[in-house]
UniProtKB/Swiss-Prot annotation:
Core subunit of the mitochondrial membrane respiratory chain NADH dehydrogenase (Complex I) that is believed to belong to the minimal assembly required for catalysis. Complex I functions in the transfer of electrons from NADH to the respiratory chain. The immediate electron acceptor for the enzyme is believed to be ubiquinone. Its EC number is 7.1.1.2. It is found in: Mitochondrion membrane. GO terms for molecular function: NADH dehydrogenase (ubiquinone) activity. This is NADH-ubiquinone oxidoreductase chain 4L. Keywords: Electron transport, Membrane, Mitochondrion, NAD, Respiratory chain, Translocase, Transmembrane, Transmembrane helix, Transport, Ubiquinone. It catalyses: a ubiquinone + NADH + 5 H(+)(in) = a ubiquinol + NAD(+) + 4 H(+)(out).
Length: 89
């Protein structure tokens, strides 16, 4: 349980510190999502519940789709702008 909280905090820290790089922001979001999935998985093992394990598989599937859509949007953004860094004004 402490490991998943630690991973979630690393994801938040990575998201906050890397506000100009979209790829690192996407990786940080994935780390946070996988930390939550790991916490759900640990809880389902502790309570001997198969529903939590099924839910974890569902979350991992959605995370894969989210990554594919995010990278597709990133490629379109790169083609439009020529750079993937975010400009704050």
């Amino acid at each position: 349980m402490n490991f998943s909280i630690f991973l979630f905090l690393i994801g938040i820290l990575g998201f906050v510190l890397n506000r100009k790089n979209i790829i690192l922001m996407l990786i940080s979001i994935e780390i946070m999502l996988l930390a939550i999935t790991f916490l759900i998985l640990i809880s389902s093992f502790n309570f001997d519940d198969i529903l939590g394990q099924t839910f974890a598989i569902y979350i991992i599937t959605i995370a894969g789709a989210e990554s594919a859509i995010g990278l597709g949007i990133l490629v379109a953004y790169y083609r439009l702008r020529g750079s993937i860094s975010i400009q704050y004004k």
